[in-house]
Amino acid sequence: MKITVEDGSQISKNAVKELEKHADMIECQCPNKLIEILHKVREFTDYTEDCIEKYPEDRDTHKWLKSSAINLDQLLSTTIIQLARFEGFIDENNEFVDRGEGS
């Protein structure tokens, strides 16, 4: 499986799930912690979208918050991909490495 990004710079949900499976390849929990933060940012992005509809008087504020959350998502996505490459989860072509399971 290849890591893919959506909207140009956000890691896809399927790639996040696959990375979660590979995160046990190293002892430290940094990959898992970053993925947890990414999930929270995505929840917040969805929440701000709801606020845009629910609170039209604060529409501009919530649009700004949503835009900021998307920027955080993009930063976290690129950080997670680079960390996965550093730790050997993925290769230079963003393909997941074979863990050698079942051999």
Show which residues each predicted segment covers.
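Amphipathic alpha-helical coiled-coil oligomerization segments
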Residues: 48-51, 55-58, 62-69, 90
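Terminal, compositionally biased segments
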Residues: 1-22, 88-103
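Short, charged/polar, low-complexity loop and linker segments
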Residues: 10-26, 50-60
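Amphipathic alpha-helical binding modules
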Residues: 66-103
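Short, solvent-exposed segments of well-ordered alpha helices
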Residues: 6, 24-35, 59-63, 67
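Generic alpha-helix signal with a bias toward terminal, lower-confidence helices
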Residues: 38, 50, 60, 77, ...
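Amphipathic, heptad-repeat alpha-helices with coiled-coil/zipper character that mediate oligomerization
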Residues: 29-50
